């Protein structure tokens, strides 16, 4: 997420919503605190622990959830993050035009 923000020249404050793939609650808390994100802007409709993270389509579910939340709130930018095996991760910026 930091690398994505650096590449785009944006800050956490420029992002309305974050869809964080939280396989474990403690991991989500760490990411929120480490990045300085307002918890109210993270997984506003519930995340993987509440909604689920179906095998093979977690990214699709998360991107769709983020897009719907941005539309419902009239917000412009969101970031979706996904964990990848081997302690890796990916983040994507979504911007409504």
Regions found by a protein language model. Name each.
Residues 1-97:
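Claisen-condensing/thiolase-fold acyl-transfer catalytic domains that form or cleave C-C bonds
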């Amino acid at each position: 997420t930091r690398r994505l923000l650096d590449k785009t020249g944006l800050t956490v404050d420029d992002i309305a919503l974050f869809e964080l793939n939280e396989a474990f609650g403690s991991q989500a808390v760490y990411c929120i605190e480490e990045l300085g994100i307002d918890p109210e802007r993270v997984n506003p409709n519930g995340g993987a622990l509440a909604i689920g993270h179906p095998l093979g389509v977690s990214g699709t579910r998360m991107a769709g959830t983020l897009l719907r939340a941005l539309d419902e709130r009239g917000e412009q930018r969101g970031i979706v993050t996904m964990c990848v095996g081997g302690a890796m991760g990916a983040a994507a910026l979504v911007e409504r035009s």
